[in-house]
C-alpha cells in the first residue's frame, strides 16, 4: 500500500478535466469521469441511444450511468488533505519522481516506495518540465489538426452518403413512377379492350339468343299443331297433314346454325409478359434529345437541311474541305451541335432502307481530319450497317465485329448513353412500342462526346438515302 499515496491523487482525478472527480460516474466499459465532463465530451447519443467512452470508444448507455459512491467517498476523504501535501505522511510534496512522474514528500523519497528512483527537487523539475510545454502544445495542436481533417473527411463522406441516398431514392421514385404510369395506362387500355369485346359479344350473343328463342317458340307451336291434327277425321287429317308437314320442313330447313363467336383478347402468357416488359422498357427511356446536325462539321459532300435534322450525301462533285479543324475532310460524316458530358441521353435516327451507315459518339477531342480509325481508343464508339446486310460493331480490333443478322433490318436506331453507368447501347427502334438491343459498349467514356453520324458515300445513288434525326415529338425531320 506504500505506493498508493503518491498515485492516489492521479487515480482519483478525472481523465478529462484532470481534477478530482466531481459527481463521478462509471461507464459500462469501466472508465470513470465527472458526470459533467462526460456529458460535455460525449455529445448527443447515436442512433442506437449510446455514447462512446472518451478513453476507449466503447459504446455505453447514458441511462446506465450512475454515481460511483465509492469513488465519491474516496475523493471526499482526499479533499481533507491540505493541497500540496502527501496524503499518507501529510508532509509537503517537495520532490518530483521522474520514474513515476509524481510529486512525493521527503519520507516517500527516502524511505517509501520511491526510494532509489530518479528524483529531482520540485523547483528544478518545475523549470525543466515547463520548457517542454511548447513542444507538447505543438504535438497537441498537430494531433488536433489531424483529427479535424478526419472530422472534415467524415462529414464530407456523410454528406456524400446523404446525397447519394437522396439521388437513389429520387431515381427509384422516378423510374417506379414511370412504371406505375405505364402499367396504369396499359391496364386501362386492356380493360377498355375487354369491355369493348364484352359489349360487342353481348350484343351479338343476345341477338343470337333472341333468334333461338323465337325459333324454339315456332317449334313448340308446330308441336301443338301436330297434336291437334292427330285427332282430326280422315279427310281433314290428310288435308291438314300436308300443310303442317310442309310448314314443318320449312321451319326445320331454316334452323339457325350453332352460335359461334371468336373472342379476341390477349392471352396472359409468358410471351405477353415479355411484350409488356419490352414496351415498358421503352417507356422508361429518357426523353428524346432534341439534336441537330452541325453544318460546320459536315463533309463538303453532305447537305444539311435548314431544320438541322436531315442530312444526305449529294451526288454532285463537292469542293475540297477547308482548313477548319471542326470539319470532316475525308469521312463523309457529321456530328451533332450538342455536346454530351454527363447524365443519361437517348436519341433516335431514321435510317430507312439506307444500305450503309454508321452511328455512335465521338470524343470531343478526337481529330476529324484525315481517314478515321473507328475504334474506341481513337475516340469513336460506333455501330454500322454494311452492304445492307451486316451489322458491325466497331470494337477495339483490326476489323469491325460482325453481329448476328437480325430477322429484319432496322429502319430506326435508338441510342442510349449513360455516363454514370458507362453504357452506350444501340437499339432497333423500328417498332414504335418496343426496343430490341443490338449491341452495347460497356465502358466509361473518357470525357464529353458528340453524337456522330457517318452518312457514307452515295455510291452512285445506291446509298443516297438521308439520315433523319427524330425530334422530341417522335417525328422525323
From Swiss-Prot:
This is Tripartite motif-containing protein 72. GO terms for biological process: exocytosis; muscle organ development; muscle system process; plasma membrane repair; protein homooligomerization. A zinc finger (RING-type) spans 14-57. Muscle-specific E3 ubiquitin-protein ligase that plays a central role in cell membrane repair by nucleating the assembly of the repair machinery at injury sites. Its ubiquitination activity is mediated by E2 ubiquitin-conjugating enzymes UBE2D1, UBE2D2 and UBE2D3. Acts as a sensor of oxidation: upon membrane damage, entry of extracellular oxidative environment results in disulfide bond formation and homooligomerization at the injury site. This oligomerization acts as a nucleation site for recruitment of TRIM72-containing vesicles to the injury site, leading to membrane patch formation. Residues 135-232 form a coiled coil. It is found in: Cell membrane, Sarcolemma; Cytoplasmic vesicle membrane. Zn(2+) 3 binds at residues 86, 89, 105, 108. Zn(2+) 1 binds at residues 14, 17, 34, 37. Keywords: Cell membrane, Coiled coil, Cytoplasmic vesicle, Disulfide bond, Exocytosis, Membrane, Metal-binding, Phosphoprotein, Transferase, Transport, Ubl conjugation pathway, Zinc, Zinc-finger. Residues 271-475 form the B30.2/SPRY domain. Its EC number is 2.3.2.27. A zinc finger (B box-type) spans 81-122. Disulfide bond formation at Cys-242 occurs in case of membrane damage that cause the entry of the oxidized milieu of the extracellular space, resulting in homooligomerization. PROSITE patterns: B302_SPRY (PS50188), ZF_BBOX (PS50119), ZF_RING_1 (PS00518), ZF_RING_2 (PS50089). Specifically binds phosphatidylserine. The binding to phospholipids enhances ubiquitination activity. The gene is TRIM72. The RING domain is flexible in both the dimer and oligomer. Binding to the negatively charged phosphatidylserine lipids is mediated by the positively charged PRYSPRY domains and is inhibited by Ca(2+). The keyword Membrane applies. InterPro entries: B30.2/SPRY, B30.2/SPRY_sf, Butyrophylin_SPRY, ConA-like_dom_sf, PRY, SPRY_dom, TRIM/RBCC, Znf_B-box. Belongs to the TRIM/RBCC family. GO terms for cellular component: cytoplasmic vesicle membrane; sarcolemma. It catalyses: S-ubiquitinyl-[E2 ubiquitin-conjugating enzyme]-L-cysteine + [acceptor protein]-L-lysine = [E2 ubiquitin-conjugating enzyme]-L-cysteine + N(6)-ubiquitinyl-[acceptor protein]-L-lysine. One of its GO terms (molecular function) is phosphatidylserine binding. The keyword Lyase does not apply. Its main location: membrane. Muscle-specific. SUPFAM superfamilies: B-box zinc-binding domain, Concanavalin A-like lectins/glucanases, RING/U-box.
Amino acid at each position: 500500500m506504500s505506493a498508493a499515496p503518491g498515485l492516489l491523487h492521479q487515480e482519483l482525478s478525472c481523465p478529462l478535466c484532470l481534477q478530482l472527480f466531481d459527481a463521478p460516474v462509471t461507464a459500462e466499459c469501466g472508465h470513470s469521469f465527472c458526470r459533467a465532463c462526460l456529458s460535455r465530451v460525449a455529445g448527443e447519443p447515436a442512433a442506437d441511444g449510446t455514447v462512446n467512452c472518451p478513453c476507449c470508444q466503447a459504446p455505453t448507455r447514458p441511462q446506465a450511468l450512475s454515481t460511483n459512491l465509492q469513488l465519491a467517498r474516496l475523493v471526499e476523504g482526499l479533499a481533507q488533505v491540505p493541497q500540496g501535501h502527501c496524503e499518507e505522511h501529510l508532509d509537503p510534496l517537495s520532490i518530483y519522481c521522474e520514474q513515476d512522474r509524481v510529486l512525493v514528500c521527503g519520507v516517500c523519497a527516502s524511505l517509501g516506495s520511491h526510494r532509489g528512483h530518479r528524483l529531482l527537487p520540485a523547483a528544478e523539475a518545475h523549470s525543466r518540465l515547463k520548457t517542454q510545454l511548447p513542444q507538447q502544445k505543438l504535438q497537441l495542436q498537430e494531433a488536433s489538426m489531424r483529427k479535424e481533417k478526419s472530422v472534415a473527411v467524415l462529414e464530407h463522406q456523410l454528406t456524400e452518403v446523404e446525397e447519394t441516398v437522396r439521388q437513389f431514392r429520387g431515381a427509384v421514385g422516378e423510374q417506379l413512377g414511370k412504371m406505375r404510369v405505364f402499367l396504369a395506362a396499359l391496364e386501362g387500355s386492356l380493360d377498355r379492350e375487354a369491355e369493348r369485346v364484352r359489349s360487342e359479344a353481348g350484343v351479338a350473343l343476345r341477338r343470337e339468343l333472341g333468334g333461338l328463342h323465337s325459333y324454339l317458340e315456332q317449334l313448340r307451336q308446330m308441336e301443338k299443331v301436330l297434336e291437334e291434327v292427330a285427332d282430326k277425321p280422315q279427310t281433314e287429317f290428310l288435308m291438314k297433314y300436308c300443310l303442317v308437314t310442309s310448314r314443318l320442313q320449312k321451319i326445320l330447313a331454316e334452323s339457325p346454325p350453332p352460335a359461334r363467336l371468336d373472342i379476341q383478347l390477349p392471352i396472359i402468357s409468358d410471351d405477353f409478359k415479355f411484350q409488356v416488359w419490352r414496351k415498358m422498357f421503352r417507356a422508361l427511356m429518357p426523353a428524346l434529345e432534341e439534336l441537330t446536325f452541325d453544318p460546320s462539321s459536315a463533309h463538303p459532300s453532305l447537305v444539311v437541311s435548314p431544320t438541322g435534322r436531315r442530312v444526305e450525301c449529294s451526288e454532285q462533285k463537292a469542293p475540297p474541305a477547308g482548313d477548319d479543324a471542326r470539319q470532316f475532310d475525308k469521312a463523309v460524316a457529321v456530328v451533332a451541335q450538342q455536346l454530351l458530358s454527363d447524365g443519361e441521353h437517348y436519341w433516335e435516327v431514321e435510317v430507312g432502307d439506307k444500305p450503309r451507315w454508321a452511328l455512335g459518339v465521338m470524343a470531343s477531342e478526337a481529330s476529324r481530319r484525315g481517314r478515321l480509325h473507328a475504334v474506341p481508343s481513337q475516340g469513336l464508339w460506333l455501330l454500322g450497317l454494311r452492304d445492307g446486310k451486316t451489322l458491325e460493331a466497331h470494337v477495339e480490333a483490326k476489323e469491325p465485329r460482325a453481329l448476328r443478322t437480325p430477322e429484319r433490318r432496322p429502319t430506326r436506331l435508338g441510342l442510349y448513353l449513360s455516363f454514370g453507368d458507362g453504357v452506350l447501347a444501340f437499339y432497333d427502334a423500328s417498332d414504335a412500342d418496343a426496343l430490341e438491343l443490338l449491341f452495347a459498349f460497356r465502358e466509361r467514356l473518357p470525357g464529353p462526346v458528340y453524337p456522330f453520324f457517318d452518312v457514307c458515300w452515295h455510291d452512285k445513288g445506291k446509298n443516297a438515302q438521308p439520315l433523319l434525326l427524330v425530334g422530341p415529338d417522335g417525328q422525323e425531320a
